[in-house]
Every structure is written in C-alpha cells, then in structure tokens.
Amino acid sequence: MAKKPKVASNTIALNKRARHEYFIEEEIEAGLELQGWEVKSLRAGKANIGDSYVTFRNGEAFLFGATITPLNMASTHIVCDPTRTRKLLLNKRELDSLFGKVNRDGMTVVALSLYWKNAWAKVKVGVAKGKKLHDKREDIKDREWQVAKQRIMKNANRG
C-alpha cells in the first residue's frame, strides 16, 4: 500500500502577537499585490508579518511592515525591497467598511495571517482595539487555568 502524500499547510506566516495585544472585532480576507520574486519567497516560507498593519491612502488600503525576504537566487536586474508597502486587493464595500471602523476611536487594522488560497496569496486582516495591561494579564490567567484544569482532569482519569 502506497503512502499518502503529506498535505502541506496553507499558512505562510502568523501574527500571534496581534491576538495578545488587541481585541479582534472583525476579520476580513484580502488579496495582495505581489511581484514575482515575492511569490517565490512566499512559497519558500520567507515572510514575517509580526509588525504589520494596514493604512489607507487615496481610497486604497496598503500593508505596511510586512517583511518578505528575497531568495538568494533572486534576479539581479530587479531591486528587491523586503519591506515595501503592498497594496491590499479589496472591493469598494470592504474598503469603506474598514475605513469607517478605523476612524472610530482606538481602532486599527492589523494583519493576522498570511496564507495560500488555491494559487493566490491572501492576508487575513482584523479590525482591532488595543488591550490594556490588565486585559493581557486576565488572558494569561485564563490560559494558565485551562492548562491546570487539563492536568487535573488527566490525573483524575488515571485513578
């Protein structure tokens, strides 16, 4: 019997820090306007969206702070800028919705994950509100309690 081929994960990069530092109120999927070398680098998994956020200019949305490291084999006649701003591909209704929510007090749009959908690179952006220090501490307490609860249940089941 032949082995089943491993299914590769569609996720390229995650922004775990965003969920720690923000309350995510809404998530939207957006396309990215990429150059050829960027697509090759994404296929190799060389992306970081840890410090990325979305800004609006002239009625369009742009992703700032995302780093896509060029491959060593990248073309020499093209200038590869790893931190260039990349245009988000959203329809007018989604842009207006995001822009209206960002104009509210304390709201921002952050990149949550970068992934493949069929052959297209997509970014999941979230409309977020910043957490205070005590909110972060509550999250840590809840997480630790869940781990302790699992440990107690595991030991109780052993009998």
From Swiss-Prot:
PANTHER family: SSRA-BINDING PROTEIN (PTHR30308:SF2), TMRNA-BINDING COMPONENT OF TRANS-TRANSLATION TAGGING COMPLEX (PTHR30308). InterPro entries: SmpB, SsrA-bd_prot, SsrA-bd_prot_CS. The lineage of its organism: Bacteria, Pseudomonadati, Pseudomonadota, Gammaproteobacteria, Pasteurellales. Belongs to the SmpB family. Keywords: Cytoplasm, RNA-binding. Required for rescue of stalled ribosomes mediated by trans-translation. Binds to transfer-messenger RNA (tmRNA), required for stable association of tmRNA with ribosomes. tmRNA and SmpB together mimic tRNA shape, replacing the anticodon stem-loop with SmpB. tmRNA is encoded by the ssrA gene; the 2 termini fold to resemble tRNA(Ala) and it encodes a 'tag peptide', a short internal open reading frame. During trans-translation Ala-aminoacylated tmRNA acts like a tRNA, entering the A-site of stalled ribosomes, displacing the stalled mRNA. Its main location: cytoplasm. Pfam families: SmpB. PROSITE patterns: SSRP. One of its GO terms (cellular component) is cytosol. GO terms for molecular function: RNA binding. GO terms for biological process: trans-translation. This is SsrA-binding protein. Gene3D superfamilies: 2.40.280.10. It is found in: Cytoplasm.
